[in-house]
């Protein structure tokens, strides 16, 4: 039986409060803060202008208990409450955003609950976007989490081992076409190590996929690396195997190549370039269908408070250009963000799209963010 969403929230709150009954002889600390954001968007799609407004509130409660100098128990719970209106219809939603209990020692970290799991050096076109869906255009960088347990161990040679087990995630994550089968956990791990002039990582994950008609086993294997060789250079590569003959393509390959550099002009112009190729085939080394996307980002700090940025994407298959321009002013607690965007009318899936980051059409968005 699937656990209702309200029950999940209640369980998370109870788990979060349990440490409050632990012996008061331990050093303990609670703190509460949050984020309030409001935005207005003017979007022209086809021949019509569509205006919308939104309001989001994310309260966050943190706690920590120190057993001794080498053992720490802490956690956090965040709720996501938002309202969005396009003046024709209203959308109000309330959901659990994060609920984490974390136990840390000098070399290990164990984390359980609704959490964010991400890795890899790419920033715009992320081959290793397996468990999140962070949109680089979104000023808030929000993404749904996953329910599970994640363990990290840091070795004395600065290498890091990750292990995770996920359960109860009934929605698609990252680039997934189908969700994970209910009541069947998925498992994975990652090993990061230092190499000359940089670092590299090897990642594995396996899960049971539910298409709605049948299930099959999916295995993913990934390799990534980053180097500092005067410029920053990195890659992410992944191979996905679907153990079934009932889908058209049993193999999917993705690779991202990227680099960045800061020019000593004025306050410093930061450039980043990435290119992603994805291939689907019925054989491991086949090439039945492919797609290529390139991206460039440039940022420049006008002052201590002001920063401007531009992101441009090119879809080689659809020959479409996606443009996003941003100005942001940052105070101690306030952020003002103005975004201008120009996307194809019929976007082909580069961006998923949301109320704070449209995926098609052109227009502008003003957002105010208050952190306390």
Residue ranges and their predicted role:
Residues 30, 69-75, 107-110, 158-162, ...:
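Repeated loop/turn-to-beta-strand initiation elements of outer-membrane beta-barrel proteins
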Residues 38-44, 67, 79-85, 105-107, ...:
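Transmembrane beta-strands of outer-membrane beta-barrel pores
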Residues 49-57, 92-97, 143-147, 183-187, ...:
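Residues that define the transmembrane beta-barrel architecture of outer-membrane proteins
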Residues 195, 226-315:
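Detector for outer-membrane/organellar transmembrane beta-barrel domains
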Residues 329, 334-335, 342, 358-372:
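Outer-membrane beta-barrel "beta-signal"
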